[in-house]
Amino acid sequence: MIDGAGKSTLLNLIMDKLTPCRGSVSRHGNLRLGYFTQHSADTFDLRLSATENMLAKFPNADDQEMRSFLGKFQIQGQDSVKPMMMLSGGQKSRVAFAALAYQKPHVIVFDEPSNHLDMESIDALVGAVKDYRGGIVVVSHDEHFMSNTCSELWVVGDGKVSRFRGGFNEYKKDTLEKTRKRIEQSVKLLSNINK
């Protein structure tokens, strides 16, 4: 993924935060979208427990229902009732993902979800995403996260979004080969200039 290629613009169009300059964006009127970023866990009051935070977001739920729901995301027992400041980064991310999943979105858009997370936290998030039964759209530079959560690869660049036929390893090989060819062309141009 190349910075400045238009990934954020694409996500903002998907999330209806931007209007396209030309063309259109169509979505079903009942489509529920969720949005998960590297900062999603920062929205909680860390003095409160995961259960208390969830109940604050969803006041129509009861304590037992929320604890049971959090358990589906491996936030169980004491972890669900102790202050969130005592949870690991991965646990906080799982609580954030649980809060998002509780809203039952059809599709969750992930914007660099693993930035600033350690491997244990990334693996915890990967596990939660694998258990999710809706659609996902991921924008990430994290090969490990993408390889373990995505079944299709779409490339953003040159003002287009196109499906890449193959997995992440094939994409890397293809990108390296294109880069190698560009470097060879540049070297030839420079050598011709220096003659």
What are these regions (language model features)?
Residues 1-195:
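ABC ATP-binding cassette signature C-motif
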